[in-house]
Swiss-Prot record:
Gene: MT3A
Function summary: Metallothioneins have a high content of cysteine residues that bind various heavy metals.
Distribution of this protein across tissues and organs: Expressed in roots.
Stated name of the protein: Metallothionein-like protein 3A
Single biological process term from Gene Ontology: intracellular copper ion homeostasis
Origin species: Oryza sativa subsp. japonica (Rice)
Entry's family note: Belongs to the metallothionein superfamily. Type 15 family.
Molecular function via GO: copper ion binding; zinc ion binding
Amino acid sequence: MSDKCGNCDCADKSQCVKKGTSYGVVIVEAEKSHFEEVAAGEENGGCKCGTSCSCTDCKCGK
């Protein structure tokens, strides 16, 4: 998986601002790890990709 999304230059995914409170659930179990990718796609509308990299888990634009 790439550390970059669309126009977002993320050297580290930890730099990305997680928007939405639904991400509080993904830390519960590894089984939910596939769910975070689905949620990221839905959060895409509220994501801001650019030099500031305010992407949800850096998956904005995917």
